[in-house]
């Protein structure tokens, strides 16, 4: 293959990939490439520009490759540009988005980490990963983290960076495993979350935990679980706030208007998680839907969603935000226009930085040690 064709092919490859930084992915596997394009695109811009290596003007193929590479670099950098326009861009923190951190990363403090068995489900041990600061003065407020995975997969060990970051700030973070569908159907995972909280409450003395100051944090399926737990008629004691990363909160809506099966077979997943269709288990669908169950005593809530999420529609958070506003419940809805599902997987990417900043501020407000709930920068309180 000639040099011109190599340049043209290289530029075309990166240009097609970069389109996923601005357009929705049509399939599940392309969503994975979209996640990389939107949250690691600033890393991909440089190899895209290799088409401008000396000699690019010698052939038509080289010139075409250079143009495509330049266009790809611009699109790969667009998520950072959009994030900076929305949240500002700083050279050092604390700030929502710090430019050097995109490439250099952030210092994550050393913390104490241990694995504890808190219960058994379906004959299996259920463990939690407990993160605590190396040195603690007094009892620590607790963040209970519930992983995603369509209720059928995932692990407490996923995405540990935020847990370590929060532990370094003086929180105890317990990331839990829970029984997975289809063996463990709703409300099984919510009951597992309760068991984890009860276990920590029983061990609060020797683990130096303040179980009167608890925040529930869930991602995707875990977001649904923590919202359902908070909306239950018998909520977990001591919960002062909920953080929901891109979780569904209206299971009837998720069934009635499913997403593209090329992306996610949501009806199959719901049927395996709830135990069947809404016509078979109407009460379970209602109990699993925080939108339908939330009342005036629902805890303060931070909802985070990517504006172009292909797996869980942002309308879930918009409707819950309106519901909480009608109930007078303090809440905040943070929508990231460029971001897709799982955007915080890149801890140092634009989504990871901004959401970490917002989560830390939210925890300070609801657990103490920070200004009242009203947001200060930018104002997203509803």
Q: Over which residues does each language-model region extend?
A:
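Hydrolase active-site cap/lid region
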Residues: 83-107, 227-283, 346
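Short amphipathic alpha-helix adjacent to the substrate-entry channel of hydrolases
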Residues: 157-174
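C-terminal catalytic histidine-bearing segment of alpha/beta-hydrolase fold enzymes
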Residues: 3-5, 11, 18, 24-27, ...
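Short beta-strand element of the alpha/beta-hydrolase
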Residues: 138-149
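Gly/Ser-rich "nucleophile elbow"/oxyanion-hole loop immediately N-terminal to the catalytic nucleophile
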Residues: 201-216
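Short beta-strand/loop motif that positions the catalytic acidic residue
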Residues: 297, 303-305, 309
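Alpha/beta-hydrolase active-site loop
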Residues: 185-205, 355
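N-terminal cap/lid segment of alpha/beta-hydrolase-fold proteins
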Residues: 21-46, 89-138
């Amino acid at each position: 293959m000639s040099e011109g064709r190599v340049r043209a092919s290289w530029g075309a490859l990166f240009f097609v990939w970069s389109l996923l930084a601005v357009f929705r992915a049509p399939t599940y596997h392309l969503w994975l490439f979209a996640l990389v394009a939107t949250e690691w695109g600033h890393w991909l811009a440089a190899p895209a520009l290799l088409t401008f290596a000396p000699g690019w003007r010698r052939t038509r193929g080289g010139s075409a490759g250079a143009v495509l590479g330049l266009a790809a670099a611009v699109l790969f950098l667009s998520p950072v540009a959009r994030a900076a326009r929305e949240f500002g861009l700083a050279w050092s923190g604390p700030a929502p988005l710090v430019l050097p951190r995109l490439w250099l990363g952030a210092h994550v403090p050393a913390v104490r980490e241990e694995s504890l068995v808190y219960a058994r489900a379906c004959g299996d041990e259920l463990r939690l990963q407990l993160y605590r600061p190396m040195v603690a003065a007094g009892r620590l407020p607790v963040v209970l983290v519930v992983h995603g995975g369509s209720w059928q997969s995932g692990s407490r060990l996923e995405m540990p960076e935020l847990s370590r970051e929060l532990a370094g700030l003086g929180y105890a973070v317990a990331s839990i495993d829970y029984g997975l569908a289809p063996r463990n159907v709703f409300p099984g995972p919510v009951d597992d979350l309760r068991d984890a909280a009860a276990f920590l409450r029983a061990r609060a003395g020797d683990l130096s935990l303040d179980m009167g100051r608890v925040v529930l944090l869930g991602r995707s399926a875990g977001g649904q679980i923590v919202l359902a737990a908070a909306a239950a008629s018998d909520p977990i004691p001591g919960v002062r706030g909920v953080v929901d990363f891109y979780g569904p909160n209206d299971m009837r809506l998720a069934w009635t208007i499913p997403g593209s099966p090329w992306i996610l077979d949501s009806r199959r997943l719901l049927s395996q998680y709830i135990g069947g269709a809404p016509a078979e288990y109407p009460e379970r669908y209602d109990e699993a839907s925080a939108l339908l169950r939330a009342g005036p005593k629902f805890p303060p809530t931070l909802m985070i969603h990517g504006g172009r999420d292909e797996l869980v529609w942002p309308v879930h958070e918009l409707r819950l935000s309106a519901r909480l506003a009608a109930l007078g419940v303090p809440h905040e809805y943070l929508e990231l226009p460029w971001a897709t599902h799982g955007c915080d997987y890149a801890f140092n990417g634009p989504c990871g930085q901004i959401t970490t900043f917002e989560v830390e501020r939210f925890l300070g407000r609801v657990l103490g040690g920070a200004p009242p709930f009203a947001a200060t920068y930018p104002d997203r309180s509803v």
